[in-house]
Amino acid sequence: MWTSGRMSNAKNLFGLGVSLYFWGLMDLTTTVLSGSARPLTEGPEDNLSDKLHQRMKRSWVWNQFFVLEEYTGTDPLYVGKLHSDMDRGDGSIKYILSGEGAGIVFTIDDTTGDIHAIQRLDREERSQYTLRAQALDRRTGRPMEPESEFIIKIQDINDNEPKFLDGPYVASVPEMSPVGTSVIQVTATDADDPTYGNSARVVYSILQGQPYFSVDSRTGLIRTALMNMDREAKEYYEVIVQAKDMGGQLGGLAGTTTVNITLSDVNDNPPRFPQKHYQMSVLESAPVSSTVGRVVAKDLDEGINAEMKYSLVDGDGLDVFDINTDPNYQVGIITVRKPLSFESKKSYTLKVEGANPHLEMRFLNLGPFRDTTTVHISVEDVDEPPVFEPSFYFVEVPEDVEIGATIQIISAKDPDVTNNSIRYSIDRSSDPGRFFYVDITSGALMTARPLDREDVSWHNITVLAMELNNPSQVGSVSVTVKVLDVNDNAPEFARFYEAFVCENAKAGQLIQTVSAIDRDDPQEGQHFYYSLAPEAANNPNFTLRDNQDNTAWILTRRSGFRQHEQNIFYLPILISDNGRPVLSSTGTLTVHVCSCDEGGMVMSCNAEAYVLPVSLSRGALIAILACIFVLLVLVLLILSMRRQRKQPYIIDEEENIHENIVRYDDEGGGEEDTEAFDIAAMWNPREAQLVVKNRQDMLPEIESLSRYVPQACIMDNNVHNYVLAKLYEADMDLWAPPFDSLQTYMFEGNGSVAESLSSLQSVTTDSDQSYDYLTDWGPRFKKLAEMYGATDSSGALW
């Protein structure tokens, strides 16, 4: 049988027992027999039996050990003792411990069965351990008892202070809140065992923040404790809350947190103007909507509670001024509503009201939430430009008005008190034709040139008025002049008329309809009257019929017209209008006599241009145009092909092939310049001109002398002689750089001699040119000095 406990001097123990110890609190030994637990105390054996038969008031669980956490001693902590009734104390029984923490946290004396804790125990990390114990025969290793499981529970002590979940806390509560208004709830937790003692029982209290706030000791709810807290007096509060365990008793652990409480604003302060009277001034020339001044009502509230609405409630300038509210700065801006005049009114008085648009009903007793102030506005005089009365002129003038006639009196005056004299003029940019002028003193607008409605029917001019004493003050007015029509234009044919009459025409046949135009524009409308001119009133050939619709018909009076007798008739027609006075003009109608077929189709007459369109059909005309277009395309194609043909080479009678002489200038082993000579120009030296060309890749330090080369072999047409002349030119040039490559010139023809023309070879010629000065040019010209300097006459360059 197993027995667990802290053993005393008792020797005769039987059955399965468990001893429970509470280190630091109790020292009891309990033996469990048949489900009954009895405490064992140290004493004589004769008293032990009586003790065992005394029943405890409570039952003990045989398979549990309890040990306090956070043991700080230096020796291992004794937990309890395991004992088997098979153990006779001779060391033949070996106790083995296994399970959670065995060998690491807990150890067992394999001989005595004593269990010790060798590490610090923390209930908050682990509250219990489950282990298994076994008794073995030390010699054979055979189990003496079945393996038994037991639990070691860690007994809590108050080793953890309460901790707040969050912090610091931030909260707000409206100002003027009643006492007991909830602000925020804070919560602290204690890691100790809440089921054992008061180690985890937390009590809240305020260390700082009274008498403004209070906290519920059990829930941690913070409430207002003082009535009528005013944000404008104090806005921010710092409250320190303490949470203490052990129910707040002495010796308990405590933690603190900070709660920052802000009083939010309510509309409990009415607006007030800092001044009861404002004095402002404005120029009379201030434009409409310009700012006169600003007023502001102070409100101790903030945000929406400090918003302001300004209005004009009284005064003699309600229709002259406006006030608007600046939503960003809550300022009332007074502006000009109508134009001002110092001469009309010099000052105004306004009563301005500022009010809160957002009110709270529970604070209406603190009102009224509005205030008024008086604004005095003075209008300042300025030197204003002259003002025209009226501000616009409209004048109607007949176009036959005489030059110099007054058509309108323009009037302007100085609005200032000084009433300066006015001088008038016309803005010439508005009257470029200079049709009008204005009297400088009286303002009489007169005509300066004849007016013609048919040319310009409307004139828009600008008249200027300037103060005599202050020319910078200039006013202007627009004058619109409408030129009225008079009957000054005679009617005339609408276009040039040319009629045709057939030889077989009958009397009374219509040959032409005529109409007329008139540049005039009478109010009653145009109406024209047609008749034959007096000299043709009794015309035997043609007659005229007025249709009374501004048109007239020309009719034949007889038949039997003959081209060979007279092929053209001129018929004068008189056209009159209905104006006052009546104007008329004579237009001449040209009538051609033509031969026609029986259907009246013109066949031939002197005006061939009119016969063709009549005799040709539309299809024939299209065919003719198509043929003309095709011919034009063919001509353009032929011209284009001829331009693209290559010109044949001109070969003289001897069939000599002309080549080009190409000169290559090589320096440093590379071709730098190429000069090509057209052999056609060199073929006839009499006509060719010698052109000296300088090298473009090198400029001498000293300006080159004029290189004139006599025209050698002018009478010789052989190219060989021309090349010799070029060689001579190279020899005579003092500044020409040498060509270090062999120049080959090829010429196919009779008598061609190919020789070296290299400038290096020219040293061997009979030229008297000396190159000794090259030695004085420095190391850069050393190579040239060696090549062109004085050498042994017996030596050869190549």
UniProtKB/Swiss-Prot annotation:
Classification of source organism: Eukaryota, Metazoa, Chordata, Craniata, Vertebrata
Protein function: Cadherins are calcium-dependent cell adhesion proteins. They preferentially interact with themselves in a homophilic manner in connecting cells; cadherins may thus contribute to the sorting of heterogeneous cell types.
Key words, A-Z: Calcium, Cell adhesion, Cell membrane, Cleavage on pair of basic residues, Glycoprotein, Membrane, Metal-binding, Repeat, Signal, Transmembrane, Transmembrane helix
Organism the protein comes from: Gallus gallus
Protein name: Cadherin-20
Primary residence: membrane
Gene: CDH20
Gene Ontology biological process terms from the UniProt entry: adherens junction organization; calcium-dependent cell-cell adhesion via plasma membrane cell adhesion molecules; cell migration; cell morphogenesis; cell-cell adhesion mediated by cadherin; cell-cell junction assembly; homophilic cell adhesion via plasma membrane adhesion molecules
Pfam families: CADH_Y-type_LIR, Cadherin
Entry text on domains: Three calcium ions are usually bound at the interface of each cadherin domain and rigidify the connections, imparting a strong curvature to the full-length ectodomain.
SMART domains: CA
Extracellular side of membrane: 59-618
Disulfide bridge partners, by residue number: none
GO molecular function: beta-catenin binding; cadherin binding; calcium ion binding
Membrane topology, as annotated: Single-pass type I membrane protein
Gene Ontology annotations for the cellular component aspect, listed alphabetically: adherens junction; catenin complex
Record localization: Cell membrane
Segments carrying motif Cell attachment site: 88-90
Tissue: Detected in embryonic spinal cord, in the brachial and lumbar section of motor neurons (at protein level). Detected in ventro-lateral portion of embryonic spinal cord, in the brachial and lumbar section of embryonic motor neurons. Detected in embryonic adductor motor neurons and embryonic dorsal root ganglion. Detected in the caudal half of newly generated somites and in presomitic mesoderm.
Pro-peptide region(s): 36-58
Signal peptide: 1-35
Sugar-modified residues: N47, N260, N419, N460, N541
